Amino acid sequence: MSGLDINGLSMRFDLPNGSSVQALKDVSISLKPGELMSVLGPSGCGKTTLLNIVAGFLAPTEGKIELNGHLVTGPDAERGMVFQKGALFEWMSVRENVDFGPRMKGMPKAERDKIADHLLEVVGLQDF
């Protein structure tokens, strides 16, 4: 099926003291192309964990996610994530963060470099 299919998704985090936290348990969701969904709930209920798994940033403990019939195994150009607060990938330089989106879309490096140079100069961050 095309769209987003989440089947039997569970996520458990093991803690250093030997205990664990069950962040998600047996979540199943199906969205057809064009359908929208909001994820709402109190702090600590697993919203961010779910979205990080859908984006491919975390691997679930159990279950699977398929997007347009393809198994989600990591981040790629088919999915994105808008963070609650402004965020950069901490392990990347400012330039690498600016380059990330166009690179995921498959834009040629020369074109990405030109755009990154321009944008960084506009905001005065060309030296970062």
Where are the language model's segments positioned?
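Conserved coupling/switch loops of ABC nucleotide-binding domains, chiefly the family-specific signature
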Residues: 61-64, 111
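Short coil-to-helix segment of the ABC ATPase nucleotide-binding domain corresponding to the Q-loop/switch region
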Residues: 92-99
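Conserved ABC ATPase "signature" region
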Residues: 99, 103, 110-128
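The feature captures the beta-strand-to-loop junction immediately N-terminal to the Walker
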Residues: 40-42
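Helix-to-loop junction immediately C-terminal to a conserved catalytic motif
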Residues: 55
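Conserved ABC transporter NBD signature motif
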Residues: 63-75
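Short beta-strand immediately N-terminal to the Walker A/P-loop
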Residues: 37-38, 81
